Amino acid sequence: METTCGLPVLPQKISVNFMLRETVDDLGLSKSVTFFLLNSPIMLRLFQRTQFQGSKTCPRVFSKSFHSLPFLRQELILKVEPLKRDNESEDVKRRRLVYQSRKRGILETDLLLSRFAKRYLPTMSVEEMEEYDDLLNELDWDIYYWAVKNYEVTPLPEKWKDSKILAKLQEMSANNEGEILRMPNLDDSP
């Protein structure tokens, strides 16, 4: 049987409603919810459209086989472009980069980037801030694995091989001083 995205490609003559009923019955939902799911034209169209679509590659990709319903078990690919910030003052850019370094959502990356921003951001030139801004637009786990030089998990792209900012981040991430890592305070007080 031919497959697309790991799902069987079924002839259109097979009843979509039958497959949807089989899936919904397995969920153990209330009768009213089950009735809605089985009789909703939106659900039928969603099922028909999502079942056979392939994926496209994008520069920045969030990919996850995220759903337990078989007809939704496919890769979800979203292309997220960073916001263009024209005429951003140097001070505003520094503050934004501090915020973006601290509020990533993954503890390991938060710790490394917040310490890096505290140590190096106040003395960065505009060009270095642009490079750091580009680095922050990468995925969190990619940044983390590049910072700790674990290229087996996430290979380092050519774009970052000669990066001075990434080299500084890697040097700081090595933690040769044996310092216990914690999120630095925003102000200068201890």
UniProtKB/Swiss-Prot annotation:
Family label: Belongs to the SDHAF2 family.
Keyword Mitochondrion included in the entry's annotation: yes
GO biological process: mitochondrial electron transport, succinate to ubiquinone; mitochondrial respiratory chain complex II assembly; protein-FAD linkage; tricarboxylic acid cycle
Keyword Ligase: no
Entry's Gene Ontology cellular component terms: mitochondrial matrix
Listed HAMAP family: SDHAF2
Keywords: Chaperone, Mitochondrion
SUPFAM superfamilies linked: YgfY-like
Note: This protein may be expected to contain an N-terminal transit peptide but none has been predicted.
Organism for this UniProt entry: Komagataella phaffii (strain GS115 / ATCC 20864) (Yeast)
Cellular location(s): Mitochondrion matrix
InterPro entries to which the protein is assigned, alphabetical: SDH (IPR005631), SDH_sf (IPR036714), SDHAF2 (IPR028882)
Stated role: Plays an essential role in the assembly of succinate dehydrogenase (SDH), an enzyme complex (also referred to as respiratory complex II) that is a component of both the tricarboxylic acid (TCA) cycle and the mitochondrial electron transport chain, and which couples the oxidation of succinate to fumarate with the reduction of ubiquinone (coenzyme Q) to ubiquinol. Required for flavinylation (covalent attachment of FAD) of the flavoprotein subunit of the SDH catalytic dimer.
Protein name: Succinate dehydrogenase assembly factor 2, mitochondrial
Assembly notes: Interacts with the flavoprotein subunit within the SDH catalytic dimer.
